[in-house]
Each structure stands twice: as structure tokens, then as C-alpha cells.
């Protein structure tokens, strides 16, 4: 009997031991699962940046985006990996870049300019896209509305009422009657701004003389063809024209044609003045929206953002070259031409 009790005790102890081992094994599995989840949440995110062309405004939009990420602890080479690609102002290349980002399975695409954003959107409806420097995202077919984008695109728009810019024509060139404009016929945002220019001109008794081009090799001929036909030149946020501003400003300034531009980069490249926004701030805001997406928010639920704050910027060197006087207003920022503009003169 005693022997039987001992055997029974050993059996019970064995069963309990196996149960404890099984429990430990299950706990270890659960802990491992939790650790895997933690690892997944800290997994390095891959971000593709597609920029149409290098010029000051788009470069600032890129800089602001990266700074916003860094300010929130997202460091390239650490918890994020940034793949930057520049299309060198070639539209087919924007498509190639977007397709490569999709095949690489990027976690997010940052598209700088309307063509870059359109290329990304055409390539994927799954990967979230944060755009910037897009004048009219709705007209470009990127979002359903600014308030409720839907789909996989949101970001920041550089839309600014053309009235603010063209009021500078009245202020700086009060005798002007003919406004010239050169623009890339392939850029949707440029067409929108030229249409707005025509609307403004009708309301304010100006005549518009336009010249549409499609490649940078046509810029010199286009601006030269307007000499003697216009009193002032308007430059929209057109990436082809803005990236060629040293050429445009050289011809215009030599022929005493004031240039009213749409952003500071053009003014630093020789244009007379602009009423524009800060593209680094625009890019920074886009970076903040990207962080929301990286942390789980649906990009289609994030409203498209614009900047309300503007400033008037005047190029002192160009002012002198055109034999014009400084304005007495306090809210004006005066700058000098950059080295590229000076070397083109």
C-alpha cells in the first residue's frame, strides 16, 4: 500500500512537472510574439523622395520635410531609410522613379512637384503618397477634395491667389499694360496659373502675351521673342521656367523688362520681386503629415494643407539694374542675386 502511494505521488509530480514546462514554453512563445510585435513597430521605414528638378524652392521643400522627420526622431540610416531621386526635369523619368519605388515596396513616397506626384499616383494606389509644391491637387487629379482627399494622397499645396502676386505689377510697374508669360505646356499647375492670369488681366485691363514651351532649350528663344512686346514678365511656379531663371532674368534685365515671380528662388535668380510662401515651411508641414502616416493614420483622412503666411521679396541688384527705387513699406524683404544669377549676367 505504501509502495502504491509512492508510485502515485511520483506520477502526480511528473504530470505537474510536464504542465509547468508546457506553461513555461507557452509563456516563452507569448513573450517571443510580443517581442516580434515590438520589433515590427520599430522596423526601419523606407521612404522614397521623388523631386522633379533641382531649383531653390523644391530644394527647400525637401530640406523642410527631412527636418520635420528629424525633429520627431526619424533619422535617415537609423529608423528610416531615405531614397532620394531627381528626375532632372524629365517627365518619363518621374514615371520610372515612381515605378522603382513601388517595386521596392517603399512605406511612403514624398513627391515634390505636380508631375512627381502624378507619376507616383499613376504608379500606385496602395503606398501612401505625401505631396508638396502642388498648386491644384484636385485639378491635377490627385485628391477628391482638399478637405477629404480620399485615396492614397495628401500633403501640402503651394496655391496662392494670383491676385496677391499681380498686385505687385500695379505697385512696381504702374504704367505696364502688357503682361508676358512663358510656361511649360506639359505642367498642369502652370496652365492653371496662366488661366488665372488671363482672368486677372480681363478684370484689370491688361493684355496677356503668352509663350508656351516644352523643353529647357526653348527658354532663351521664348523670352527673346517677347522683347519689345511686353512691359512686364510674369513667372508662375513652373518648374521648367524656374529652373532656367538665370537665363530668363539675364535677357529680361538686359532689356529692362521687370519680372514678377511667384516664389523667392526666382527672385534670388534675378527676378525683380514676388509675393510668395516659404517652401521650407511648406516642406516641413508635409513632413509632419508624413509622420502621422508613418504612425498609423490613413493618408486619405488627412486634409491637404496650404500656407496662409506670405511675404514680399525684392531683389536689390535687379532693382538697381532696372533703375528703380526701393519701396518705403515695412513688410518687404530685400535680397541679393545668388551666384548663378550673377554669373549669367
From Swiss-Prot:
- GO BP, sorted A to Z: amino acid transport
- After gene disruption, what is the outcome? C.difficile isolates lacking CDR20291_0805 and CDR20291_0806 show reduced uptake of tyrosine. Production of the tyrosine catabolic end product p-cresol is decreased by sixfold, and the intermediate fermentation product (4-hydroxyphenyl)acetate is not detectable at all.
Q: Which Pfam families match?
A: ABC_sub_bind
Keyword Transcription regulation listed: no
Top-level lineage group:
Bacteria
Q: What is its main location?
A: membrane
Q: Which GO terms describe its cellular component?
A: plasma membrane
Subunit notes for this chain?
A: The complex is probably composed of two ATP-binding proteins (CDR20291_0806), two transmembrane proteins (CDR20291_0807) and a solute-binding protein (CDR20291_0805).
Q: Which named protein is this?
A: Tyrosine-binding protein
